[in-house]
Amino acid sequence: MASIRRTLSFSERHQKLVDINYCKKLHVEALQRLQNQTRDQMVQNENDDRAERKRFLRLLQDEQFELDMEEAIQKAEENKRLRELQLAQEEKLATELAKLKRESLKDEKLRQQVRENSAELRELEKKLKAAYMNKERAAQIAEKDAIKYGQMKRDAEIARTMMEEHERLIKEESAAEDKRNQAKAQYSHDLEKQLEEQGKKKQEAYEQLLKEKLMIDEIVRKIYEEDQLERQQRLEKMNTTRRYIEEFQKEQALWRKKKREEMEEENRKIIEFAKLQQQREEDRMAKVQEKVKKKRLQLKNMLTQRLEEMLRQREDLEQVRQELYQEEQAEIYKKKLEEEAEEKLRKQKELKQDFMDQMALKELILQAAKEEEETFRKAMLAKFAEDDRIELMNAQKPRMKQLEHKRAVEKLIEERRNQFLADKQRELEEWQWQQRRQGCINAIVEEERLKLLKEHATKLLGYLPKGVFKNEDDIDMLGEEFRKAYQKRSEICEK
């Protein structure tokens, strides 16, 4: 029994061990199942999370799409609003441009009417046209003066050419005279040379004579030596020969002296002739130079006189033209002043007459209005009284009706008075509008006047008549350079 228990115990232990192992196995399986479940749950959770994320992303995408669509719709509406605003602005701008264009055309038409109807602008245009005519006339006069000056210049050039030709002829004559003088000098030189040669020949003849004398002396000596014995006999002959020789020597000396005197006289005559010729030539050249100087001075005086005469004629013509122009401008200015004074007096009379007529008309209108009001009041009162008399029978009601009628009449009179005042106010506003329009016209006239001055005054400096500039501001408006030139021109005209 004990062994059985022990066996059982062993079996139990074994069973227990098996149970334990089985339990462990079950526990492991349970753990595996739990792990599988956990893993499946995690996978499921992951799938759910993934689906949730996808759903959330889809929701976000849907919301983003809705936001994008809403933003696109807003942008489209904003673009539509901007396009409508732009179209409205463009339409407004086009309207403004059309309005400005209409106003510009209206202003241009008004300016055209003012230019056509303004007496001041017409007068200024007449003055500018007159200034252009004066400028053209001055240009023609300057052209004529230039032609005259060119003719004078050509005459002076011809005179200068004639003088140069005359001087050239004088130089040629002087050169020819110099050649003649040189020929004369050469002739004198040749003559002196011939005289010198003659003197040499005479000297040679004298030397030959001396040689002959020496030969004679030698012959005499030889004769004396050879025939000393015959000296006594030949003494006379020798004395005669000596006397002959002495006479010959005397004659030779006299002939030499005479020849020398003749040569000196001839040289003196030649020198005197040369001096005389030189003096004559100097006198002739002096006379020629004096004649040339006289002709040159005469021509110069003639040209100077012609220039002075032409300048004097030009100055006289310019002075006459200036005097005529000044007289004409003075007459025009005087006539203009008279016309302006007459126009001013006429306008004053017209304004005074208009004022008196307006006052009289106003009195008549007021009187007529009062009379009409009184007549109307009486007529209405009579009408209302007649109506009330017919309609009403008791004494209290006519009194009340009379008061009502009086108030009605006064109301009608007040309405008529208000209508009258409204008409007068409208007339006043119309008069003020006319005044503003006249002021605008005056401003346009002034602008057009200044525009004409800016366009033409600088081109017509020196030719503008009096009265073109109203005051110094018109001159200053054209610039400092124009003002200085105009003042300088005015000072020259005053001088």
Curated annotation (Swiss-Prot):
Protein name: Meiosis-specific nuclear structural protein 1
Protein task: Microtubule inner protein (MIP) part of the dynein-decorated doublet microtubules (DMTs) in cilia axoneme, which is required for motile cilia beating. May play a role in the control of meiotic division and germ cell differentiation through regulation of pairing and recombination during meiosis. Required for sperm flagella assembly. May play a role in the assembly and function of the outer dynein arm-docking complex (ODA-DC). ODA-DC mediates outer dynein arms (ODA) binding onto the axonemal doublet microtubules.
Coiled-coil spans in chain: 61-215, 245-361
S-S bonds: none
Spans annotated as Interaction with BBOF1: 1-315
The entry's keywords: Cell projection, Cilium, Coiled coil, Cytoplasm, Cytoskeleton, Flagellum, Meiosis, Nucleus
BP GO annotations: cilium organization; flagellated sperm motility; meiotic cell cycle
Quaternary structure and partners: Able to form oligomers. Microtubule inner protein component of sperm flagellar doublet microtubules. Interacts with ODAD1. Interacts with BBOF1.
Tissue specificity: Expressed in trachea multiciliated cells.
UniProt cross-references to Pfam families, sorted A to Z: TPH (PF13868)
